[in-house]
Swiss-Prot record:
Protein's recorded name: DNA ligase
Family: Belongs to the NAD-dependent DNA ligase family. LigA subfamily.
GO biological process, one term: DNA repair
Species per Swiss-Prot/TrEMBL record: Bacillus mycoides (strain KBAB4) (Bacillus weihenstephanensis)
SMART domains assigned to the protein according to its UniProt record, in alphabetical order: BRCT, HhH1, LIGANc
Function of the protein: DNA ligase that catalyzes the formation of phosphodiester linkages between 5'-phosphoryl and 3'-hydroxyl groups in double-stranded DNA using NAD as a coenzyme and as the energy source for the reaction. It is essential for DNA replication and repair of damaged DNA.
Matches recorded under Pfam families: BRCT (PF00533), DNA_ligase_aden (PF01653), DNA_ligase_OB (PF03120), DNA_ligase_ZBD (PF03119), HHH_2 (PF12826), HHH_5 (PF14520)
Binding site for Zn(2+): C405, C408, C423, C428
Binding site for NAD(+): D34, A35, E36, Y37, D38, S83, L84, E114, R137, E171, K287, K311
SUPFAM superfamilies: BRCT domain (SSF52113), DNA ligase/mRNA capping enzyme, catalytic domain (SSF56091), Nucleic acid-binding proteins (SSF50249), RuvA domain 2-like (SSF47781)
Cofactor: Mg(2+); Mn(2+)
Amino acid sequence: MSKEIAKKRIEELRDLLNTFNYQYHVLDNPSVSDAEYDRDMQELIKLEAENPEFMSEDSPSIRVGGTVLDIFEKVTHKSPMLSLGNAFNEGDLRDFDRRVHQGIDDANVRYICELKIDGLAVSLHYEKGRFIQGATRGDGITGEDITQNLKTIKAIPLRLNEEVTLEARGEAYMPKRSFVKLNEEKEQNGEDVFANPRNAAAGSIRQLDPKIAAKRNLSMFVYGLANVEEKTIPSHSESLDFLGELGFKTNPNRRTCETIEDVIAYVEEWQEKRPHLDYEIDGIVIKVDDVAIQESLGTTAKSPRWAIAYKFPAEEVVTRLTGIELSVGRTGVVTPTAELEPVRVAGTIVRRASLHNEDLIREKDIRIGDYVVVKKAGDIIPEVVNVIFDKRTGEEEEYHMPTHCPACESELVRLEEEVALRCINPTCPAQIREGLIHFVSRNAMNIDGLGERVITQLFDADYIRTFADLYSLTKEQLLELERFGEKSATNLVQAIENSKENSLERLLFGLGIRHVGAKAARTFAEHFETMDELVKATEEELKTINEIGEKMAQSVVTYFDNEDVLELLQQFKEYGVNMAYKGIKIADLQNVESYFAGKTVVLTGKLEVMGRSEAKKKIEALGGKVTGSVSKSTDLLVAGEAAGSKLAQAEKHNVEVWNEERFLQELNK
């Protein structure tokens, strides 16, 4: 390929990938599959490596993470990043309104209300449309240069839709589902977990290695325009519209309010809706919309007089910690859990809260009998915030982690660079039981009627010890168990039989190979098509697959380099368990009669087995249309985890709602 052709192709790929990023991460309406995006990205990376003279600082390839830094350089903000004054109740809001009206002659003041994202405030500098620098807020005067890490956030445009010079400000955050997934991975790996999504976002964005930030699935909402050359915008609401037109992601839930009564109604509305968002908010920001009035009101040394932050009441309660129980996960990690006197937190009754590891118990000086403050991290996971030391009587008991596994009494170990204690006995009954529960779960073999309770009964009766044992179960054995009758036993035997027909990716995920989640299992299944081919793969072969890193490749090779595992696979074959990929390929979908033909479909939330862009591609290949919002013309909403407000919209318009499992069933017909 000549240099001229290479340069032209590089420019084409950059434009394409920038468009795809904008559609997916800002509009929430992807137009291509993950596979197509990955192919284009790999082609761009290859061409740039072969032609380094054409490398550009705003190339989408930068998003995978660049060179490891030694230190973050300091940056002085052109204008201070001021903090906001706080309001904690309705009276504080009315006082703010009164002060605003006292400061101006015009009695008509319009406010704009926005959700206060609980993340990390950053500034973004663009020169002639190109992203040149990003910095943390720091102390408001001086921040840190985190440009390389911000370039990994796909919601931040590297090039704007206009060649404009400006500074935008916003909040980088971690979605709740990403927070849960990250902590699960850290816990399985015996690492310290993050206390909440805000800490996770801040910790990720301040990594000296941008590749780590790139893996953390951060996002960002831009909430303001600090300055823009050669352009005057009369209101804050219009500046947000302008930022959206340039390609920034702005929060869609903002609202202009004509009176303080409207502001209070908005605050009350989002206090109720808050738990349904896939990101954390800790309040509402209220600003005077008119820029001329903002300038007239001015600022104090610390904060603007024309804006205030209403802070939601903390979702924290006090209860007594009555005990600490231990659980052994399928990877052998021993996790302490606080047993609590039942208490309502964020709308649900909480009886337990994870203590994660021994270091956390020591750090917080948690003792049995203590009164503790409890909240839900990310409005999801109950956690012990701190001990109320003033309530101690002297009768509280210090807790010491055991030296041996509570399930098998093998000695516990702490692996290098891990904070968790781990049982490394491969025959540990607790690990085997947890592995069996995972194997039959919804995203794995999906055996209806075979949940934790039944697995425990079968395990205790010594009917199952390996995954393959499930396929030798008889109706007679099931009838011996509590709560099993003729019909339920027959149904379960049939459900187990049906699971033999699952596609390869479900079996792979069910095996519980360390570091291999549902998405990676599907990637392996599509790539190799059969279990035999995957078993033969080398670490080098695995690492050539997009998004498969060294750690996962090593884990897969190690897993299959085990005689017991190979024996298990042989037993699966003898029982007739399918070990080939049966999923759909786009090319196979053309000219197929389908439910989706002529229908308008909306995808929302996180789809575990299939990414949304891939789902969109398959629906369109079957004659359907995928849109980004729910309306009267919508025929179907496919709702994954953390579906959010679109579920409520679907109910309002009487739109049919499917979960991911139902959606996959229809695709596989």
